[in-house]
Amino acid sequence: MPLALYDTWSRTVRPFTPIRAGQVGMYGCGPTVYDDAHIGNLRTYVFEDLLRRVLERNGYAVRHVVNITDVGHLTSDADEGEDKMEKGSRRTGESAWAIARRYTEAFVRDWHALNLLEPTIWCRATDHIAEQIAFIETLDRAGYVYRTDDGLYFDTSRQDDYGYLARLDRAGLQAGKRVALGGKRSITDFALWKFSPADVQRQMEWDSPWGRGFPGWHIECSAMSAKYLGTLFDIHCGGEDHIAVHHSNEIAQTRAAHGTQLANYWMHGHFLTLDVHTKMSKSSGDFVRLQTLQRRGVDPLAYRYLCLTAHYRSKLHFTWESLDAAQTALNRLRHLYIGWPDGGRVDADFAARFDAEVNEDLNLPRALAVLWDLVRSNLPPATLKATVDSFDMVLGLGLREWRPVAVDVPEHVRALLGERARARAEKDWAQADRIREALSAEGWRVEDTPEGQRLFGMAMGASEPDVPPQ
């Protein structure tokens, strides 16, 4: 079936039609690099990677641009508080520039660990100050800019449909405001350029026609997407937390400057939650980093697999139990895959079923079900491998690259594994769990399979020691 995608602007799933035949321009809002990304952030990038892979499976050449916010993102999205980069500098004692480099490198490591395709272009906000100033000048000439004591602001009252992406009730927001506007005319107006305080030496500041300072958060994406994709491109992605503020403001800027709504399709991923109601976020302190998973012996691709189990527009509830289940499923798939021979052909019927699911707004949970139906089928092993290979071009689980790695297992670990096998045979589940935790504390991961226990080392990936199932 033809590709159809959910568009936040229209609130509908609609057929995908590119601006230029066979080509797609796609922009994703990247991280603010003042700290490590958490796995909730990374879920959004897994969704965007899956989108790109599905587009490429449908024959499109994708020009994929991802920005790095390394200046201008204040601690409050309402243009209040301290620049997150400067705050990170005070927290660590490093310069803001060093903070940006360190966390950009960490983010790119996470990106690669999750087997995300390399963007066509990475673009940093600090490398595009001139473009942002030029964009603000265009807005100023068009009459959308006014000045306050602390900076230049965008006048949202000039656009009757401002906030349509989020279906904002502007009148209700204005009537119910509970904060001082600090010179802003409206609660929805937002900063384009912030002035450096006269008595403060900032680490990140630049000269501009209006005075020394730094750009607001939203202007970077309008300016950089215009440079690399044009003033109207196909798809703009991000987390759903960007809808009400950041993406609404990007649209406002670009419509004022160029008369377009920036992108023809707006796509947003849902939150990862730590419990039924709590969104994972740095500001709340409720978050888990990818490195946390790795230290516990979890392959990052197990987290990618977990992301496949929920539709990108649905909440994904994170638990260690669900992650363990994802690791077990991934390891089972890997061990099956590595035993199949090469030389087969893709099964057309299963491929058609898989494509029908991924082309229906990226329904990866159902596509994953097709994969397991395939694995359980009676098709020849070489056909299974060729077809799973084809699916993995979308799933991105790196099956062809994976290899088990033998490691030495100390005798006392083998003894604990034997004790645990006896405890399970005697249905002493509490003792079996205690031994599992003891092994985990020493850097070993135990999985229970239909064939018995499997022991894995804590090396990245499912490194299997030379211990037979027990």
Curated annotation (Swiss-Prot):
A motif ('HIGH' region) lies at residues 31-41. Keywords: Aminoacyl-tRNA synthetase, ATP-binding, Cytoplasm, Ligase, Metal-binding, Nucleotide-binding, Protein biosynthesis, Zinc. SUPFAM superfamilies: Anticodon-binding domain of a subclass of class I aminoacyl-tRNA synthetases, Nucleotidylyl transferase. It is found in: Cytoplasm. GO terms for cellular component: cytosol. Pfam families: CysS_C, tRNA-synt_1e. CDD domains: CysRS_core. The keyword Plastid does not apply. It is an enzyme of class 6 (ligase). Zn(2+) binds at residues 29, 221, 246, 250. Its EC number is 6.1.1.16. One of its GO terms (biological process) is cysteinyl-tRNA aminoacylation. ATP binds at residue 282. The keyword Transcription regulation does not apply. InterPro entries: Cys-tRNA-ligase, Cys-tRNA/MSH_ligase, CysS_C, Rossmann-like_a/b/a_fold, tRNA-synt_1_cat_dom, tRNAsynth_Ia_anticodon-bd. Binds 1 zinc ion per subunit. A motif ('KMSKS' region) lies at residues 279-283. GO terms for molecular function: ATP binding; cysteine-tRNA ligase activity; zinc ion binding. It catalyses: tRNA(Cys) + L-cysteine + ATP = L-cysteinyl-tRNA(Cys) + AMP + diphosphate. Its cofactor is Zn(2+). HAMAP family: Cys_tRNA_synth. Belongs to the class-I aminoacyl-tRNA synthetase family. Monomer. This is Cysteine--tRNA ligase 1.
